[in-house]
Amino acid sequence: MGLQFGFSAVQSGKRVMQSSNEPTLTANSTKAKFSLTGAVTRIMGLVPGDTVQFISNVADIDAAIAERDAEVVAWCEANNVEFGTEAARAALIQTFGEYGICKGVPLFEKDGKVKLVGVRMTAEQKAAAFELNKEKIAEELGKSVEEITIDDYIPVTRAYSGARTSTSSNLNGVGLPLTFSDSSMWNELKENLGEDAEKINRVFEVKLNEPFSVAVETGRVIGDEKETVEVSVYKIVFQSDEEPSVRQSAK
């Protein structure tokens, strides 16, 4: 039986951690945290502050279940799982589920306006940014500089799909190890670990030599069509479950 499911945007033995030169994505023991090695960020062209988006075929699997696809029903019968149950869905995803990652794309409102999101800042960072941008803020609000206060300042930036990356170093540029947070995908990719999810680093190999294209929605609607852009996706494949080092497990 040749069940296949298309990708769309989303969302074993233990050993010591492998070299960071390997192209890997790690779902860390720290809840929601992911790590990318420099080998991956270099090929994907990621710098700190860029976003990473997960791509999967789970939506297509769910659609096939909802439509009672004949091949899916037959697979469940052949594998002694009751179609329509959570156990059947979990078995289908475990068998046929595939995941990948891509660089996030700029997002728009339905009418084509650039989508903006709030910027997280400490009180000190916000105060400093307010002082530097007083004139621009006043102009945007149609007030004088003397009239505005820091409460008038709501820092925003352009929205991108996916989760924003960061680095623990002061370096910048392509090829750095990066981290990001995605609680939904962390839970999904570590679901079968149960209570051990926060005790294990789950490592995935990133197939850098086998990129493929997937259409990702931008949020803009043109006529009756949702705008999409083609992105390069790199498939991730389970490699190992590993015990975190003392430094990695510190929270």
Regions found by a protein language model. Give the residues of each.
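Charged, low-complexity interaction regions
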Residues: V81-T85
